Regions:
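N-terminal Rossmann NAD(P)H-binding glycine-rich loop of SDR-like oxidoreductase domains
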Residues: 11, 19
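Conserved mid-core segment of classical short-chain dehydrogenase/reductases
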Residues: 75-90, 133-136, 176-180
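Catalytic Tyr-X3-Lys loop
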Residues: 82-101, 120, 144, 194
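Active-site helix of classical SDR
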Residues: 104, 140, 148
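Residue(s) in the substrate-gating loop at a strand-loop-helix junction
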Residues: 124
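Short, small/polar-rich loop/turn modules that mediate ligand/substrate recognition or access, typified
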Residues: 156, 161, 218-220
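A conserved structural motif in NAD(P)-dependent oxidoreductases
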Residues: 192-203
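Short C-terminal tail/terminal secondary-structure segment
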Residues: 208, 219-232
Length: 232
């Protein structure tokens, strides 16, 4: 039977790489993004949607999944709290946290009913450390990690596997300005123990392993993949 994955943030970066690896391995992939449809080959279905708005079109379009990948996210330009408005804070939480809680509920209910399914959130090293973003980003990713762990505890007996992935510096469209002249790319690579940025395809490979069903005794881990950054 063909397995089905739903991926948010599918049009670029990590989400695009995730879609690619699952399609290559025969999965049916539903992808959501507010950007335009990516060029992917295989059993791919796309919905252009802002995840902070009405989600009912999603549930009509994709009614049941084996795997839910919460990959969409937003950054905050490393702003400290006194430079962050209430509106900006609420918007970042709407993307990074509340879109996850809202999208999870209907699919989780069905996973619990059939005693099967996997949910993976895209956390960050900022889910456990300061300095991986500004105050709004760090707070939203801490909240996401807490939600992930509690969800994993609450639904472990229902055989729903739940994980978080915590990347460090990943070379994506979101971080593209760091690679412009005068950007932070070289400094970040130099400060990373392995000497380079992580690539989206490496996150996708980890995701595929977690979704394989071969790690049945793992539950609730927030798995760091940051080139050794958090060892310092």
């Amino acid at each position: 039977m063909t397995k089905t994955a739903l991926i948010t943030g599918v049009s670029s970066g990590i989400g695009l790489a995730q879609a690619g690896i699952f399609l290559e391995n025969g999965w049916r992939v539903y992808g959501i993004d507010q950007a335009s449809k990516p060029d992917l080959v295989g059993d791919f279905h796309f919905l252009q949607l802002d995840l902070t708005g009405d989600l009912s079109p999603v549930f009509d379009w994709c009614q049941e999944v084996d795997l839910l990948l919460h990959t969409a996210g937003a950054l905050d330009d490393y702003k400290p709290h006194l430079q962050v408005t209430d509106e900006a804070l609420e918007q970042l939480f709407a993307v990074n946290f509340f879109s996850v809680t809202r999208l999870t509920r209907p699919y989780l209910e069905k996973m619990v009913a059939r005693k099967s399914g996997t949910i993976i959130t895209m956390c960050s090293i900022a889910s456990s450390l300061a300095g991986g973003g500004g105050s709004a980003y760090t707070a939203s990713k801490h909240a996401l990690a807490g939600f992930t762990k509690q969800l994993a505890l609450d639904y472990a007996k229902d055989k729903v596997q739940i994980f978080g992935i915590a990347p460090g510096a990943v070379q994506t469209g979101m971080t593209q300005k760091d690679f412009e002249p005068g950007g932070l790319a070289d400094w970040v690579a130099d400060q990373t123990p392995i000497g380079r940025w992580t690539q989206p395809e490496e996150i996708a490979e980890l995701t595929f392993m977690l979704a394989s069903g071969k790690l049945a005794s793992m539950q609730g881990q927030i798995i760091t993949i940051d080139g050794g950054w958090s060892l310092k």
